[in-house]
């Protein structure tokens, strides 16, 4: 019988924040394009070490409303917001990221910032 390692208690785990964003551009973008744009923005602005510390993680994207959610370490929220604000082009098309809000849970983020875009 294999023994599994103990899980970390909540006090020792990394704390995350979730950022709701909207993409405004010349055309509609796919999930993969947005995922790549977030990662490239993080790497170009924060660098490899900064991106590793911020731990940006793409959660969800609604292609119809062009809104989405990205997870980030709580100490680096403002850095990722800054990186997203610097995006001007996605795959050669003009586009910008508009940050709608930040929350500690996905449920509250959807209720507070994304409900007007049809998220449930």
UniProtKB/Swiss-Prot annotation:
Its EC number is 3.1.26.5. Keywords: Cytoplasm, Endonuclease, Hydrolase, Nuclease, tRNA processing. GO terms for biological process: tRNA 5'-leader removal. It is found in: Cytoplasm. Gene3D superfamilies: Ribonuclease P, Pop5 subunit (3.30.70.3250). It catalyses: Endonucleolytic cleavage of RNA, removing 5'-extranucleotides from tRNA precursor. NCBIfam families: PRK03717.1. HAMAP family: RNase_P_2. Consists of a catalytic RNA component and at least 4-5 protein subunits. Part of ribonuclease P, a protein complex that generates mature tRNA molecules by cleaving their 5'-ends. This is Ribonuclease P protein component 2. It comes from Thermococcus onnurineus (strain NA1). The gene is rnp2.
């Amino acid at each position: 019988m294999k023994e599994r390692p103990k899980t970390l208690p909540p006090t020792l785990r990394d704390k995350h924040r979730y950022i709701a964003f909207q993409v405004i551009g010349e055309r509609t973008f796919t999930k993969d394009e947005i995922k790549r744009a977030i990662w490239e923005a993080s790497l170009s602005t924060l660098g490899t070490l900064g991106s590793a510390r911020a731990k940006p993680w793409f959660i969800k994207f609604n292609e119809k409303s062009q809104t989405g959610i990205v997870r980030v370490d709580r100490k680096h929220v403002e850095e990722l917001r800054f990186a997203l604000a610097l995006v001007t082009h996605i795959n050669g098309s003009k586009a910008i990221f508009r940050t709608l809000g930040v929350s500690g849970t996905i449920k509250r983020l959807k209720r507070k910032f994304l409900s007007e875009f049809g998220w449930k």
